[in-house]
């Protein structure tokens, strides 16, 4: 049997093949931005695949909201906020993600010789930068600093079995500002990989993670802005 294919059909197939090749070789950057976690976020995806930008935004914002309700020490309904507010030495059951971050923080604390210390929350509050801090017009006294320091120490938070954590001091508080954003960025990256993206850049509050080779195949390039100097009149 002879198979006759119209010439116009061959041309259409050829054009479609060319179009697909062109798109693959010249992927575009799709960018989403927003505010969450008390800061700004940005996601850049380099892809040649058609997808719903709004559906991706919805997934990202839902993930950010989910993480904020776990790691925030500002919002009353957050797991961390409630842990900090529990003035007790009775073992407390905490969210698995919060427990994982606490375990990792203990490891970093050990590796850094105690320099990284999430129990620094009382000091942060004393200087007016925490959720219960007050705007200060004077420097805290040595006595105030000493009292706040007495409430710190990773040795004062104990990991127990079955996801339980015990404070050895009821007033002990945790501040994961130095690590939570990195954990959340990792979760956003996992989300993007679930969308089958393999070339993207995620930034939350100045913390960045890149995946893939970027637009030119040499990796993503991030620029660092120079901080203002006193002579600019921006610092006192």
Question: For each of these PLM feature ranges, what is it?
Answer:
Residues 2-227:
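Mature catalytic core of soluble alpha/beta enzymes
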Residues 225-236:
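Single conserved hydrophobic/aromatic residue that forms the stacking wall/gate
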